[in-house]
Amino acid sequence: GDSATVFDTEFGKIGLCICFDIRFPEIFRRMVLEGADIVLVPAAFNMTTGPAHWELTFRARALDNQIFVFGTSPARDLSASYQAFGHSIAVSPWGRVLNQMDEHEGMQITTIDLDEITSVREQLPLLKTRMENL
């Protein structure tokens, strides 16, 4: 598409992108500028990119934009032709991993406090001090 996907919910403003989009900081910044507090990323990294980049990219996007980022992944199916890395993840605006699963099927519930976004942005005012003129 040619625009960011951000929508209002009873939980806050949520941004949505998919798998490969996590690699582009610009998409996340656009969603944050449109008010996203949370970004959801359904993704299926493989066994090459997953171990190397999964946690790193999710933590970077959360920290860069001081938002909550959630990545969901299929469980690894050893009988399938495509081997997903798994490791669904929840990351805080400080870049801290709140929850991370392994490669198996399962479910975790992560409780978040959207006030943490304000607190983090007061401690480290990245959005207020960004260099828009570059």
Where are these regions (language model features)?
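Beta-strand-turn-beta hairpins that frame and shape the catalytic cleft
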Residues: 3-15, 38
